């Protein structure tokens, strides 16, 4: 039998013993107070998050991938963060990948036993053709999910970089990673429900890892997402606004260059900032490794 009694995420919260007797307002205040603790817990982990981001940047520069792996809520959060990288940063869906124990079906329904399989974690990475240039980030609130451990151990065999994210201290998965992240948010508002504070902490950290690593490979100019993909009307208008903000041009100028650049926001910005045509702008960006700032030198 697995002993979960020592895990912080499984302990009862002294502040919510009488949860079923609270009014809606009382429960809301309690839950909000618990949630306030999460950002401070994440702050404590910043020194351990930094090397994971550096490793992700290194992986991207080598043509490698960032691969999130988890089960249940942890897996879903990884899939969500990976999916958002495509429209936000204009990267291919293969560059940041989210894998969940049990496959796509597990995004909406529980797949019994999937998280308990070491072999399944290994096999999912084999199917993905894991390489030594990749970074695997195993996510498990409990810090002991076999699916994640199996994946991390296979990554070690291949020579890929390994990171882990747990919401318990001294987590088992930390022993299987080069770059372990452990966040102690305290017991959950609802005992054992790690979709709450643990899930919030994981989301905050995944936001940090994906966003700051993308900054590190030139996907941002100032604080603007210049590689955004205008896949709908809202994003088309946002793209023009980004061009205006980056170059201090008019709406009409932004629209003109946006169209000349074939709706490539970053290229339109370089064309305006360096007063060049589209082809020359492309050449400048290639020489600058995709960093807008470096085209201005």
Swiss-Prot record:
The active site is at 84 (proton donor), 115. Keywords: Carbohydrate metabolism, Lyase. It catalyses: N-acetyl-D-muramate 6-phosphate + H2O = N-acetyl-D-glucosamine 6-phosphate + (R)-lactate. It is an enzyme of class 4 (lyase). Pathway: Amino-sugar metabolism; N-acetylmuramate degradation. Its EC number is 4.2.1.126. CDD domains: SIS_Etherase. Belongs to the GCKR-like family. MurNAc-6-P etherase subfamily. Specifically catalyzes the cleavage of the D-lactyl ether substituent of MurNAc 6-phosphate, producing GlcNAc 6-phosphate and D-lactate. This is N-acetylmuramic acid 6-phosphate etherase.
């Amino acid at each position: 039998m697995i002993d979960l009694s020592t895990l912080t995420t499984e302990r009862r919260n002294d502040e919510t013993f009488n949860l079923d007797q609270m009014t809606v307002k009382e429960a809301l205040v309690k839950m909000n107070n618990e949630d306030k603790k999460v950002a401070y817990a994440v702050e404590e982990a910043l020194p351990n998050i930094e090397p994971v981001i550096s490793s992700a940047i290194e992986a991207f520069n080598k043509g490698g991938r960032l691969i999130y792996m988890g089960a249940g809520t942890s897996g879903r959060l990884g899939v969500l963060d990976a999916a958002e990288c495509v429209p936000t940063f204009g990267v291919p869906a293969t560059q940041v990948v989210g894998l969940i124990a049990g496959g796509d079906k597990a995004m909406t329904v529980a797949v019994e036993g999937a998280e308990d399989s070491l072999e399944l974690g290994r096999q999912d990475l084999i199917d993905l053709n894991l390489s030594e240039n990749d970074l695997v980030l195993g996510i498990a609130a409990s810090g002991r999910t076999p699916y994640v451990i199996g994946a991390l151990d296979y990554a070690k065999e291949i020579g890929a970089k390994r990171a882990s994210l747990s919401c318990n201290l001294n987590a088992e998965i930390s022993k299987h990673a080069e770059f372990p992240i452990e966040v102690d948010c305290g017991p959950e508002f609802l005992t054992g429900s790690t979709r709450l504070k643990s899930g919030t902490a994981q989301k905050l950290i995944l936001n940090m890892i994906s966003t700051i690593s993308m900054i590190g490979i030139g996907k941002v100019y100032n604080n603007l997402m210049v590689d955004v993909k205008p896949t709908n009307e809202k994003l088309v208008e946002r793209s023009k606004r980004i061009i205006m903000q980056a170059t201090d041009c008019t709406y009409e100028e932004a629209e003109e260059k946006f169209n000349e650049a074939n709706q490539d926001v970053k290229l339109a910005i370089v064309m305006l900032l360096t007063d060049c045509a589209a082809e020359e702008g492309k050449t400048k960006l290639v020489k600058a490794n995709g960093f807008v700032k470096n085209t201005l030198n």
